[in-house]
Amino acid sequence: MFRLDPRLEQDTHGVTSFALSRVLLMNDARYPWLILVPNRNGLSELHDLNAADQARLNDEIIIVSRGLARMFTPEKINVGALGNIVRQLHIHIVARNTDDPAWPGPVWGHSPAVPYAADALAERRSRLTAEFG
């Protein structure tokens, strides 16, 4: 049975699931920030995936990147797999704009997260679910 890292569980809200990955919304209202987590236990690196799952994950990254681009018309889409704190393989996909608080630097560690208010979270999740299923 697949287990999501407790830190990801604590810091995100579920949006949907794809063939390979769970799609999670980072609980930071300042950024359109999604995280893909492949439903495979014991993985920490991209190369830990088999070839078919690598291709599927790449497809899912493109789906999310294009969807965020349509929804938010960002200046840039950042895609990254760091894993220095949370070892479980997960991919961050963040729509960035020149007026966001961390621009042009990374969103990680810039400042404490600003959690979604309940109504804003419901609206954001509804839009994301409509876009991604």
Locate predicted features:
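HIT superfamily nucleotide-processing domains
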Residues: 1-133
